[in-house]
Amino acid sequence: MIRLENVSVDFPAGKDAQSRAVNNVNLTIQQGEVFGIVGTSGAGKSTLLRTINLLQRPTEGRVFLGDTLISDASGRELRQHRQRIGMIFQHFNLMHTRNVYDNVAFSLRAAGKSKEEIASRVPEILALVGLQDKEASYPAQLSGGQKQRVGIARAIANHPEVLLCDEPTSALDLETSASILALLKSINVRLGITIVLISHEMSVIKSICQRMAVMTGGNIVEEGEVFTIFSAPQHAYTKQLVSHTTPIELPERFKQNNKGVLLKILFADDSVEQPILSDVAQRFQVSVNILHGNIEYINDRALGHIIAQISYRDDPAAENLAAAITYIRQNTFGVEVIND
């Protein structure tokens, strides 16, 4: 378990001035989970991540790894704590004059492992990340995805309890990003390593994390299960991020020229599998026209967004229309009228 208590980080900002990058953060990350921190550039997420392994010392506050206070550690004690925490970076940070084998072996040598232990561990860990045939290759001969796999192998070579991931896919294309995220998820499941991942992309957080925090201006403004935050964001900034990830909007002309009521409907879990809109059409004698929609799965839970037009049939009856909307509201996760 990782626990941050009242952690703040200040940087010099001119003569006798300080700029606060992280402001009074309290955060608990459970053992074995994949936890995401999302925010735009300058939000403070990289600085916060680096306080966990003390690459960045907190100006204020305390950092715990398990029950151990590590933020006051230094020297040999700090090095011992850092061996419990691996880290991968946006731009890989490989040694270009050493081949793949030696890049991974470097972290083992630094930890004092014997030649025999290194000779046994390096092939094992390269096989885990799918690079068993690249031992003799140099970074210049590798693709971006392969370089990140070397970074992952190096980071987990010493059996860490925690893996910190600093924008691990931002330098990669979509297909390669997906393969790296799948690898991280597999490592989490197979090895039980706690993963803390930061990204400016909500889609990355959504694809791999169980819980998440939203960060802006050095502050965590929202925290919770990924599904809950995507289905019912509370903070205005979080709502903005979610809307960019799942854009469910119609051209303005549809709203202006539409003869019925336009509803933005949120389906979740079991309601996704129910014929709710079909039931509405039959029960209340209204016409239902689906204009836009999608369904996705977050941590094996269904989340759907639909924009539907509800209108009268041959015999207009306002009470039928109102009753239909009420029925939808009662049987889904949320309804918003968007053409009042």
Swiss-Prot record:
It holds the Pfam family ABC_tran. Residues 2-242 form the ABC transporter domain. It comes from the Bacteria. Coiled coil: none annotated. ATP binds at residues 39-46. One of its GO terms (molecular function) is ATP hydrolysis activity. It is a peripheral membrane protein. GO terms for cellular component: plasma membrane. InterPro entries: AAA+_ATPase, ABC_transporter-like_ATP-bd, ABC_transporter-like_CS, ACT-like_dom_sf, MetN_ABC, MetN_ABC_transporter-like, NIL_domain, P-loop_NTPase. PROSITE patterns: ABC_TRANSPORTER_1 (PS00211), ABC_TRANSPORTER_2 (PS50893), METN (PS51264). It catalyses: L-methionine(out) + ATP + H2O = L-methionine(in) + ADP + phosphate + H(+); D-methionine(out) + ATP + H2O = D-methionine(in) + ADP + phosphate + H(+). Keywords: Amino-acid transport, ATP-binding, Cell inner membrane, Cell membrane, Membrane, Nucleotide-binding, Translocase, Transport. The complex is composed of two ATP-binding proteins (MetN), two transmembrane proteins (MetI) and a solute-binding protein (MetQ). Belongs to the ABC transporter superfamily. Methionine importer (TC 3.A.1.24) family. This is Methionine import ATP-binding protein MetN 1. It comes from Pectobacterium atrosepticum (strain SCRI 1043 / ATCC BAA-672).
